[in-house]
A protein has these predicted regions:
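Short helix-terminating capping/connector loops at secondary-structure junctions
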Residues: 43-46, 111-112
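Conserved glycine(s) of the Walker
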Residues: 26
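Conserved ATP-dependent motor core of P-loop NTPases, especially the RecA-like helicase ATPase domain
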Residues: 2, 12-16, 53, 70, ...
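Conserved pre-motif I regulatory segment
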Residues: 1-22, 33
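Short amphipathic alpha-helical segment within the helicase RecA-like ATPase core
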Residues: 61-65
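Residues immediately flanking
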Residues: 23, 34, 54-56, 121
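Conserved RecA-like ASCE P-loop NTPase motor core of nucleic-acid helicases/translocases
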Residues: 45-58
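Walker A/P-loop NTP-binding motif
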Residues: 30-44, 67
Length: 172
């Protein structure tokens, strides 16, 4: 199947967006461009944008990259210099966006960077459960734990319990 090349600076950004591609193809780069465009072109506040990914490492990378992109873009505009955001600045210039308004939106986002909703799927679900526990009429005396070692513990217990029975003389 042939796919059209994705251009983060010009692709329409209305509605939902799914960005799917192989490793090393620039997904994070493109996602950051789309986020910056949502902030500037649509005036969406950073805490109103949801980014969901698979791993904790990816959430850390996205958060770090967003902070550095905002900082770098603000500096590029303030110093009126050429840089890695020329594509966006050219597009915004063609659309007659005011640099003062762009700077204000970007600085506001940078000031609220800790409110960015960048989660793993599990982290997002946990957040929803915590935020809406009362309206869900669910049990709010619950704890969300990490069961990542549960399988290893169960296997270890099973082997420790059953191997000596199956193989008398098996060292325990």
């Amino acid at each position: 199947m042939l796919y059209k090349e994705f251009d983060a600076a010009t692709t329409p950004i209305e509605g939902r967006m799914l960005l799917e591609a192989s490793a090393g193809t620039g997904k994070t780069y493109s996602l950051m461009r789309v986020l910056l465009r949502l902030l500037v072109e649509k005036g969406i506040e950073l805490d109103r944008i949801l980014v969901v990914t698979f791993t904790n490492a990816a959430t850390d990378e996205l958060s770090s990259r967003l902070r550095s992109n905002l900082t770098e873009l603000i500096e590029q505009i303030r110093l009126n210099k050429s840089g890695s955001f020329n594509d966006l600045l050219d597009s915004w210039g063609e659309k007659k966006y005011s640099q003062d308004i762009i700077l204000e939106k970007l600085q506001t986002a940078l000031n609220k960077i800790d409110d960015a909703a960048i989660f793993t799927i599990h982290g997002f679900c946990q957040r929803i459960l915590q935020d809406f526990v009362f309206s869900s009429k669910g049990n709010y005396d619950f704890e969300i734990g990490d069961d990542s070692n549960a399988k290893d513990k169960a296997l270890s217990t099973f082997l420790r319990t059953n191997l000596p029975k199956a193989y008398p003389g098996y060292p325990t």
